[in-house]
Amino acid sequence: MLFWVLLSSFCVFCFSSPDGFLSLSCGGSSYTAAYNISWVSDNDYIETGNTTTVTYAEGNSTSSVPIRLFPDPQGRQCYKLPVRKDLSSVLIRATFVYRNYDSQNSPPAFHVSLGRRITSTVDLRTNDPWIEELVWPVNNDSLLLCLLAVKGRGIPVISSLEVRPLPLGSYKYSLEGSPDIILRRSYRINSGYTNGTIRYPSDPFDRIWDPDQSYSPFHASWSFNGLTKLNSFNITENPPASVLKTARILARKESLSYTLSLHTPGDYYIILYFAGILSLSPSFSVTINDEVKQSDYTVTSSEAGTLYFTQKGISKLNITLRKIKFNPQVSALEVYEILQIPPEASSTTVSALKVIEQFTGQDLGWQDDPCTPLPWNHIECEGNRVTSLFLSKINLRSISPTFGDLLDLKTLDLHNTSLTGAIQNVGSLKDLQKLNLSFNQLESFGSELEDLVNLEVLDLQNNSLQGSVPETLGKLKKLRLLNLENNNLVGPLPQSLNITGLEVRITGNPCLSFSSISCNNVSSTIDTPQVTIPINKKQRKQNRIAILLGVSGGALFATFLVFVFMSIFTRRQRNKERDITRAQLKMQNWNASRIFSHKEIKSATRNFKEVIGRGSFGAVYRGKLPDGKQVAVKVRFDRTQLGADSFINEVHLLSQIRHQNLVSFEGFCYEPKRQILVYEYLSGGSLADHLYGPRSKRHSLNWVSRLKVAVDAAKGLDYLHNGSEPRIIHRDVKSSNILLDKDMNAKVSDFGLSKQFTKADASHITTVVKGTAGYLDPEYYSTLQLTEKSDVYSFGVVLLELICGREPLSHSGSPDSFNLVLWARPNLQAGAFEIVDDILKETFDPASMKKAASIAIRCVGRDASGRPSIAEVLTKLKEAYSLQLSYLAASAHTD
């Protein structure tokens, strides 16, 4: 690139508005400054803090600047800054001013973070004002700049915040291939220039170039104001012409050097700029900290160039140019500290935490990354792993399935969170060491505690636990404290818990002990006064006879008890087998579904060879019946199996459901410890697969196909809500539960969580929340009140998936777009169809899309009473489908 180094040529910038500049007046109002730079109030970029203005003397004049201060010492105070994604890097400049605004003469110190990295500690005792400059490689459309209080050092303050676009490809030798790096400016020196700083408009990117006189030892400078032609095509940083036209040049010595102090030891990135502004072409070596980095570098007349160096683990910096031929010279230099950005927490963890925050109904202040630069409130981390979660005194009511996604947890504290029912959704937390569920209203141990193989502390005190302590707790070999105080537990404790090294606390229970005492009459265990009665010889003889008779009688009685016990056990086994047979006969009388033997199931699945799905209930296998029909076989885990009556009811319910848009129930197997359900197999896979799963890469669904799927699924749900008797709430509507056949007809599947209700049951209160994160109705979660409108909410999420072509919870985009409902709802309400799936762009009828989007938005309304019925949803979707068909017909006719 050829350009003319002529200062006057930059006057054009004095009269044009700079493109891409963001200038925030922190605590101030909007105004236009010199060179047409627009400063705006920071009110739209941060929600916390107080504002004031400070006036102070500066030389012979006074300055008055706004300040935003943050009295709350807890957490992060963050600015969310928009960034253009077409840029490769941006400059972030923050100015911090104290100047005794509070008349306390106590300048604060605080941390500054950009994204996940603490970049610096601002100490206004050292410099006031303090200017911090950072170069950030663009990898998102926004970033967070946060202030974090230092304990005992006052409250953070800020005066201004600037975002400036940098030249494309600039600073690439440091940032290229390393998107997890931030550059923090240490020095930017306009070598050889002594008449103040240079910035915009001389530098169109508004970098501040400091004058050279402050850096010793000082050498002669050389300045050219004339017209000079320079070839600078290889300088991607694009330094301003006014910087390149000056140079520090060796006067009489053999070397030219800069000795620069560094704030902190670390890795540094150095750029040296050279311009051939002399008719000579000097040659010299470049030495950094006594190490030769460039042995023979020549500055060619009329050429401009750069040298880039990275120095690792240094605490001081000396740059020396040693003469080889003619006088060494340098036009400018930049020095940056290289800051590594810590790895981010897993998307699964972030998704789970965001869902948990949403359903607490509280703003926990969780934004950006949970672990860096500092952990969120209520959280502790090890590196980028969330290892502890503390949510006491929050009305959770149940442990959401989402907690099970926090796989790195070592400590989970949910004490005093109004939990009820059974302990659930913790079985996947294999690393958990401490579990505190005390001071709740839990009634049952559940079936998952035995899976917590690394558990050391289990605190269940002050609950409503009933019955006996499960033997399975003895499997927790690392357990050292089990607190069961103040519950309603009875019976002997398992002997597997009576071991050295395990403390078991049991006070406050009706009858709980390691001894095999009877709990039929608790009062019999109370100590009574002992009374001594004198006995004569005759009585002693009679007593001996009585003792012998008693021993003999006791032995006979013990034998009798063993006989009775064996009889009862045998009778119970016969009764259990009789119950299963009776249940099978009862099911046969329905004449609605087939009863399979376990042998038949094993043959159909080829010994359970092909797994096609897995969930909390068990696994699903692909099978083939003797007549060639393909089936999906759902096998329940032992711990998820139902009692006989419950299983009969479930099979009866499934046998009654017959609709073209519901997956057909083919039969079942019910044998001791075996509960298996058999459904028709649909070869087209799930809707989720077609939208963003493996099938989406091979065949994408167009808009009319998506509407057809939506109509089919709505028909199935409408039958459940309004066509069957009793009516049924599905409870787990999601795109992976909408299956497609080979002709792309959709059917709703998986009624394992479904709930029957009559017209008298306008709502149903549950003690356990069932469903999938991202689809759960927030009102159902918070109130435990289940209605058909909960299905409508979940189906609304599916409609948004069809429109946007993405998952309900996704960490791939910006933090704002993580939750599909919260992201899509305001955009679609504003008619912003830019968020529609890219695959659908320019292929849909706007009226059809608008109608589908409108009903989807109503479905996901937070207030259940304002949501439409599924029948109304079906009507609107049919209308949208008809509009799209008409649009396609008109387009074909036009073509």
From Swiss-Prot:
Residue intervals on the Cytoplasmic side: 566-895
Signal sequence range: 1-16
One Gene Ontology term, aspect cellular component: membrane
Superkingdom, natural source: Eukaryota
Catalytic activity, EC: 2.7.11.1
Top EC class for this record: transferase
Topology class, membrane: Single-pass type I membrane protein
Extracellular domain ranges by topology: 17-544
Modified residues (Phosphotyrosine): 679, 780
Localization (cell): Membrane
Record-listed Phosphoserine modification sites: 736
Glycosylation sites: 36, 50, 60, 140, 195, 234, 318, 416, 436, 462, 498, 521
Family matches, as SMART domains: LRR_TYP, S_TKc
Coiled coil: none
InterPro entries attached to this UniProt entry: Kinase-like_dom_sf (IPR011009), Leu-rich_rpt (IPR001611), Leu-rich_rpt_typical-subtyp (IPR003591), LRR_dom_sf (IPR032675), Malectin-like_Carb-bd_dom (IPR024788), Prot_kinase_dom (IPR000719), Protein_kinase_ATP_BS (IPR017441), Ser/Thr_kinase_AS (IPR008271)
Protein name per UniProt: Probable LRR receptor-like serine/threonine-protein kinase At5g48740
Catalytic activity: L-seryl-[protein] + ATP = O-phospho-L-seryl-[protein] + ADP + H(+); L-threonyl-[protein] + ATP = O-phospho-L-threonyl-[protein] + ADP + H(+)
Residue windows of the LRR repeats: 385-407, 408-430, 431-453, 454-477, 478-500, 511-532
Active site residues of this protein: 732
Residues that bind ATP: 612-620, 634
Transmembrane domains' residue ranges: 545-565
UniProt family annotation: Belongs to the protein kinase superfamily. Ser/Thr protein kinase family.
PTM-bearing positions, type Phosphothreonine: 767, 772
Chain ranges of the Protein kinase domain: 606-888
UniProtKB keywords: ATP-binding, Glycoprotein, Kinase, Leucine-rich repeat, Membrane, Nucleotide-binding, Phosphoprotein, Receptor, Repeat, Serine/threonine-protein kinase, Signal, Transferase, Transmembrane, Transmembrane helix
